[in-house]
Structure formats: structure tokens, C-alpha cells
Design a protein with these regions (language model features):
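N-terminal alpha/beta PP-like core and its mobile active-site loop of ThDP/TPP-dependent enzymes
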Residues: 2-151
Length: 151
């Protein structure tokens, strides 16, 4: 690798991308993504939470108590900012992800920007069974996150 190569995890690259998105609002350069609401667990704690911790001054993160309320708060923020700034909502895999479905549908129906980052299932079956990981037992490629395809 060359001297100018930057090595990042996928989560670090994603967070870096989010931190570098800007929009002009009234001739003032503002961050497009104002912050993150998150509940961290398996599927996002060891990657995304760690990456967000590194940029907490640039992209603040608030821990929510319920996934749906976090996503709805993100929608309210976008609406109050006239769709010019966006909040991010993240959760672990399973019921936490499905709790954000109603808010996702609401944002879609009202054309309000919201970025939802749902946790992912484990890449292998060694930790099986995982607490609250929803998946199809006959087809491990089908997960709770597939419910977001419609919205």
C-alpha cells in the first residue's frame, strides 16, 4: 500500500462519508447529516458505534429508548428543517429494526428524508442462537431487514 492509502473499516468509511456531506442553507454551509439516534446492540455496536465515537464532535450521537421514537424524531427534525437536513437512526438487528418500519413508511409516504441504518446478522452461525435475531430458519439469507424493501 502506498503512503497516501487510508485504511478504514466499512463503518468508519460510512461515518466519514456522512460527516463530509454538506448543503448550502441561506448561503451558509451546513452539515447534511445533523446527528444520529441510536440503540446499539449486536449487529452495530462493535462497528458503527465505535466509528461514531471517533467523530462525536462532528456527528453527535444520542442514545434513544425506542427505535420507532428515534426514527420519528428524525422525521420531525427533517420536517422542521424543511427537508434540508437529515437525521440518522440506527438499531441492532431483530425487533429493534422492525420497530423502525412504521417510521420508515411514514417518511417514504410524506417524502421526508431519513437515513435508517439497521444492524446486520452475524456472518457465520457460530454465535447461534443470537438473542432476538429474527431470521428464517430454512433460509438464513432472509432477515428482519428484508421488511424494509417495501419502503
Amino acid at each position: 500500500m502506498g503512503k497516501n492509502t487510508i485504511r478504514l473499516t466499512m463503518a468508519q468509511a460510512l461515518v466519514k462519508y456522512l460527516c463530509n456531506q454538506y448543503i448550502l442553507i441561506n448561503d451558509k454551509k451546513e452539515q447534511l447529516y445533523a446527528g444520529v439516534f441510536g440503540i446499539f446492540g449486536h449487529g452495530n455496536v462493535t462497528c458503527l458505534a465505535e466509528a461514531l465515537e471517533q467523530v462525536k464532535d462532528t456527528l453527535p450521537t444520542w442514545r434513544g429508548q425506542n427505535e420507532q421514537s428515534m426514527a420519528l424524531a428524525g422525521i420531525a427534525y427533517s420536517k422542521s428543517k424543511l427537508r434540508q437536513q437529515i437525521m440518522v437512526a440506527t438499531s441492532s438487528i431483530g425487533p429493534g429494526a422492525t420497530n423502525m418500519l412504521t417510521a420508515s413508511a411514514l417518511a417514504h409516504a410524506n417524502r421526508l428524508p431519513l437515513l435508517i441504518i439497521s444492524g446486520d446478522v452475524f456472518a457465520n452461525r457460530r454465535p447461534d442462537p443470537v438473542l432476538q435475531q429474527l431470521e428464517h430458519f430454512n433460509n438464513p439469507t432472509i432477515t428482519a431487514n428484508d421488511a424494509f424493501k417495501a419502503v
